[in-house]
Amino acid sequence: MRRALLLAALLACAPPAFADRLKDLTTVAGVRSNPLVGYGVVVGLSGTGDGNSQLTQQSMQSLISRLGLSVETGDLKAKNAAAVMVTADLPPFLKIGQTLDVTVSTVGQAKSLKGGTLLMTPLMGADGEVYAIAQGNLVVGGLGVEGKDGSSLTVNIPTVGRVPRGGMVEKMVETPFLETDHLVLNLNRGDFSTAAAVAEGVNRTFGPDVAVALDGTSIRVRAPADPARRVSFMSLLENVEVDPAPPVARVVVNARTGTVVIGGTVKVTPAAVTHGSLTVRVTEDQRVSQGASVVVGNNATVVAPGEPVVTPDSQVQVVEEPAKAFVFDPGVSLSSLVDAINAVGASPSDLVAILEALREAGALRAELVVI
């Protein structure tokens, strides 16, 4: 009897099959990264910079003047310098003095940033405030080489580089993590069934009425007010496992490449499909004939032979392949759908046409998304 009770308790506490952690399904409202951007100059390039770009020359003059030197714009040659935009993402809770990676991209005519050094660049947020300062040596994965005869060789993208840990935080971004008596979890993909499952899983772990689903995306969770307890609570909360609802039946079609992605929950109602293809071939040929000669006198003396005449000869041929027909039974599944279409040798473009026709006929029990 004791063994049976222990087994029942273990089964009750075991996570559901195919369960996902809340940290993989949701994000905490207000806890997010913030984009930063700045304009700067990269120096130390081996002749692959912007050249005589006025933008780069003005930037260099402004930078040098801030260092206490005076120089005319015309005296500056920017072959070894490049104007760049610097971008970064400021993660939540990053403190003053900590570092982050930055991405550097050219805005002028620079051929490559390889071997360059980014000079001190302020990084601003959307509010115009400076949150970080970036500086350091660039790591460039691409390669660009150009010869004097105009020939060139480019591998990957040499005009974009990174400065690992090249940005230093100068100002923190406040988050509402500790400002209220509750937390709000937002699903990465809104779904009412999944929102209800998340609330049920949290209440099963922490007790009744701790979580309530506000809508198909947000779940409100009561949390301790003490910061230390709230962090511990969050570490437990994000590891709660729930069984999300099956995704919406959806078929995604890329009409340009012929790529089709069909969800596992897609089904088709009874339908008969006939699909044939029409091929039109146009061939061009040239026919050459001798033009009329110039004849003089009663003796029909040929004074000048005729010029050759080129006449285009076009042939149009229409070939219609036999129509391919197949029938879908009620509630046919994904595998049966794919097998039936592949069995008749349908190409990706044929598959796109068949799916669109099934949707128009009301036989496709799924959302068709064309990208």
UniProtKB/Swiss-Prot annotation:
Signal peptide (UniProt feature, chain positions): 1-19
Top-level lineage group: Bacteria
Quaternary structure (record): The basal body constitutes a major portion of the flagellar organelle and consists of four rings (L,P,S, and M) mounted on a central rod.
Organismal lineage: Bacteria, Pseudomonadati, Pseudomonadota, Alphaproteobacteria, Rhodobacterales
Gene from which the chain derives: flgI1
InterPro entries attached to this UniProt entry: Flag_FlgI
Keywords: Bacterial flagellum, Periplasm, Signal
Protein name: Flagellar P-ring protein 1
Gene Ontology CC terms, in alphabetical order: bacterial-type flagellum basal body, distal rod, P ring; outer membrane-bounded periplasmic space
Role according to the record: Assembles around the rod to form the L-ring and probably protects the motor/basal body from shearing forces during rotation.
